[in-house]
């Protein structure tokens, strides 16, 4: 059809031209916008004219930014950090175009964009057996205990807490190279023989978010958030009698390694934690001389060569530092783990045998069990019924109103009533605040399918009880179908001896480790639900700004809480065995872990009450008493970890980010099978090729028990494969002697799902258990 409007084509051309101009402007803006990149360098490639690495790094930045005007900014202002201990490199602000050019430069191994990380947010020592009579040998006072320094990367520390009292501690070892940095409300005297180091890292954070508002948080090691104080006290807090939260969990609070020392590295702020700051803290902590690093945060999963934390902790491991990280709070979804590198000990969360019971009584019909940490001025008489309301559409499918989001509740419908709120979307305590502001007098917090029957107690601002999914559905159904629904709430205090326990926490992130199915993750479980530990004096226990309450101890849940349990036990082991490598300590923790609860039944999963698998609990639940004397260990050195990386289809340049030492090369000692890494867990992965019917994996154990000892092997039966171990007996004649064995898997028929079991070496005094996983990939 002919064009009848002579203006149509020119007008269309103008519109298209304008769109192209905007598109080009937007693209140009994206390319020219600076952000932080972590640049990994090959230090051995530094040319002779340069006298130091900083000079060389500056020239590299200059080479890609030299077209910028001097008025715009100096190149040295682009550099935020340099890294020289755990790994070699720098963090700098670059545009996308500059970063791409820099990656082409000689000596530059990798240029990785800044990553934002998130925090993974008394009774536990007793539950772990560290207060039984036989535990005296573990907590018996030794000078070597005082020599272990645990670096805690978190939100800082509240030094006035009684948990950081240094009474009875020996002088700080001369080998310690750390420092106490001063700043707002943090002086040199805030450090002592317990807190031996305190540093802050914020350049990456400020580059990404702008200057820190010092009216809202301290630009110093002082902790306003509370998370860092809680984790540091869990690792190595001194004993404090009468510790409690509003009378709940009353008892003696103490860290796992109560005589170890703490160095606080503040890397997390109101807006999160940034990789350039975290890496600088790891680098500095290793230079300071820490023996253990406790890192309760995560930032998703990247390939090994693009994961800056993985690269930095590889360097820490090379320097003999044990690294413990939280698995994440992404459970119960599968493949939700973070921090999956084999040289990192990845910790999931479990419950303990302590609870904070509360009840919800609906009408005169029945009573439902729940939990609560509420203690406040408002008390609802337990014998009085109050109107009960649920504003969701149905009992099974939560909606925006049922989540009690801010502004979603109408005072006309909730004033003077107990309100039912579904768990999820917003923090649990915030829901109670929303109910209170709308005039509600109480809250029933109901789990959804995601959380199942797992109960997490909170210090709410109004009377509130949390209940499981099944109970929640019944309570909601009653509220929706009864014309005059009523309920009463009763808070019952603290109860111990809960069965079954431990149970895998529903929120604890799950495997498998999709980067490397041959490496089991998480590695193990530790207590992470309702943990009492020290707290900041600047934040309410609910972490709500409107909450005026202040406490010395708080109860928190998360893999953030389980990680420092393992870090503390690792410090105990290090103090008893100072010559052990990080891998030996990890092996001791994993091979002594248990997989049955206090009812002698297999560990279960709180999200569904079904038995858990190694993808949920790893090698099992930590057992500190046995971990200090494991009998045998599976040791792994830096070169063998590097050999593992050689099996991961990484290019020579990608492998280079892990080689501080230029002479480290692939020797292919694992026969191109990552399952041959001398890991304490054994994973056989049959490929898509159905012609592969058999597979043999090799392990080597080191005797750290009696000089003369004999171990016999036993293996769980599997449906889809036969498993043969050779030899069946290991006879040791000296301490530190190494012996090897092979495990051969022969497929009977390919199973659609992985099979789980265990391999145990047993002597008259020790039992050394490794989880075994057999996986058949679907045929092509």
Curated annotation (Swiss-Prot):
GO terms for biological process, alphabetical: proteolysis
Q: Name one GO cellular component term.
A: extracellular region
Which Pfam family is an annotated match for this chain, by its short name? Answer: Peptidase_S8
EC no. given is 3.4.21.-
- Which cysteines form disulfides? none
Entry-listed glycosylation sites: 165, 394, 663, 731
Please identify the protein, giving its name as recorded: Subtilisin-like protease SBT1.3
